[in-house]
Amino acid sequence: MAQRIVVTGTDTGIGKTVFAAALTDLLGACYWKPVQAGLAEETDSHRVQRLADLADDRLVPEAYRLAAPASPHLAARLDGVSIDPLCLNPPDTGGRPLVIEGAGGVMVPLTADTLYLDVFARWQWPVVLCARTSLGTINHSLLSLAALRSRGIAVLGVAFIGDANADSEETICRLGAVKRLGRLPWLPELTARSLQHAVAAEFRRADFAP
């Protein structure tokens, strides 16, 4: 089976999709967002395609496309849709790696009684945890790491996003016993080229090897 990496986060709106685009490009991977909630603006798949300059055949179609920009369990209810977590299984990517992006944080509910964490535990694929660098990140990051490990999920490391914060980054990695993969800074002009350069300066492909 081709390499598969799950990208999750400590919260929503922290830059997880931008990092997923960067990782997809770095690995020459395909990309899959199992559940897209919010269709009025650019979807996460389209944003990743633009920022990673992906051909259409490297985008795996979403299993569910929901109109409301909300937690998947609520967006599905508003659309009158029933999400079946057991159907969230990506197709074969022909030997190419696959980057899978969750929604929001680790504990976001997919249904009334199923969390994304439950799906990650069933998949048992390694996870990259995206964490912001601003105030409050230590608590959120350590709780997320504890939740993942409580279900036996391997964590490749933490990808920090935001302005440099050496103490918070070091504290999270030391207390969380986790690898620091790098830090993706805020980019004044976010393009495929600027993202590629930022990733090349901070991240190593070897750190994501199976």
UniProtKB/Swiss-Prot annotation:
Annotated residues that bind Mg(2+) are located at T17, E101
What Enzyme Commission number does this protein have? 6.3.3.3
The lineage's top-level taxon is Bacteria
List of catalytic residues: K33
Q: Which cofactor does it need?
A: Mg(2+)
Instruction: List the subcellular locations.
Output: Cytoplasm
Keywords in alphabetical order, please. Answer: ATP-binding, Biotin biosynthesis, Cytoplasm, Ligase, Magnesium, Metal-binding, Nucleotide-binding
Q: What class of enzyme is it?
A: ligase
Q: What does the entry list as the binding residues for ATP?
A: G13, I14, G15, K16, T17, V18, E101, G102, A103, G104, P185, W186, L187
GO cellular component, alphabetical, reads:
cytosol
InterPro entries according to UniProt: DTB_synth_BioD (IPR004472), P-loop_NTPase (IPR027417)
Q: Which GO terms describe its molecular function?
A: ATP binding; dethiobiotin synthase activity; magnesium ion binding
Q: Does the keyword Electron transport apply?
A: no
Q: Which GO terms describe its biological process?
A: biotin biosynthetic process
**Which is one Pfam family of this protein?**
AAA_26
Q: Does the keyword Iron apply?
A: no
| Catalyses which reaction(s) | (7R,8S)-7,8-diammoniononanoate + CO2 + ATP = (4R,5S)-dethiobiotin + ADP + phosphate + 3 H(+)
User: What does the record give as its pathway?
Assistant: Cofactor biosynthesis; biotin biosynthesis; biotin from 7,8-diaminononanoate: step 1/2
PANTHER family reported in the protein's UniProt record:
ATP-DEPENDENT DETHIOBIOTIN SYNTHETASE BIOD 2 (PTHR43210:SF2), DETHIOBIOTIN SYNTHETASE (PTHR43210)
Q: Oligomeric state and partners?
A: Homodimer.
List the NCBIfam families: bioD
Q: What does this protein's UniProt record list under function?
A: Catalyzes a mechanistically unusual reaction, the ATP-dependent insertion of CO2 between the N7 and N8 nitrogen atoms of 7,8-diaminopelargonic acid (DAPA, also called 7,8-diammoniononanoate) to form a ureido ring.
Q: What family does the Swiss-Prot or TrEMBL record give for this protein?
A: Belongs to the dethiobiotin synthetase family.
Protein's name according to its UniProt entry: ATP-dependent dethiobiotin synthetase BioD
